[in-house]
Amino acid sequence: MRVTSLDEICGTHQGDYKMTTKILSKHIGVIAVGSGLIGASVYLLMIYVTLAHIEAVSGHVPFDMRPFGYGPTEAATLLEALGVEGRAYYLSHQIALDTLYPAMLTLTLIATICWFGQRMPNRNLVRFGVAISIGIALFDYVENLGIAAMIWSWPEVSVPLVFATSTATILKSAFTTVAVLLTLLVGVSWTRLSEADVRP
């Protein structure tokens, strides 16, 4: 099985997949905008509907909205406060939506970074941004699995499971911050290079 490299993802590979990546490069802007709109819609739905409902029912901040993590006591407090219906809602509504969101966010960040990074002579920043963006989705899905496992195992609270899920939440938040900053940095570099091209 052939493993796709980061260069191929951004359409800069010069091997067998040159034609495919060239087509991808031409449409990368459309992909960035399209996935961005879907991702933003899902995000707003989570913030103003599912996560808001979870917080209203429990009186506590949901796991997803705790960038600095949580311990076993905090996890148990939230799970107990949710009640049977609240825990079921977390699984059927929030986790379901958060299955789509990480993929859309990661696709948006990768497409945007690759779009802006096409003019950059040094591809290292672009590669790093793509890798970090992929990390966001991985940790977000690990977080989702951990939250689901905590709900399924309630009223038992596994300390290792809580710490593993909390670590995934922290890393997801950190990677998201870094990826957004890198996207802005690549965008600024793209703007400067574009301005340099139009100067006489």
Residue ranges and their predicted role:
Residues 136-185:
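Alpha-helical transmembrane segments of multi-pass integral membrane proteins
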Residues 7-18:
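Short, Lys/Arg-enriched N-terminal segments with co-localized hydrophobic residues
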Residues 113-152:
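Hydrophobic alpha-helical transmembrane segments of integral membrane proteins
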Residues 28-45, 93-114, 172-190:
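Hydrophobic alpha-helical transmembrane segments
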Residues 20-28, 86-93, 118-128, 157-168:
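Membrane-interfacial loop-to-transmembrane-helix junctions in polytopic alpha-helical membrane proteins
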Residues 188, 192-200:
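Short, charged juxtamembrane terminal tails flanking transmembrane helices
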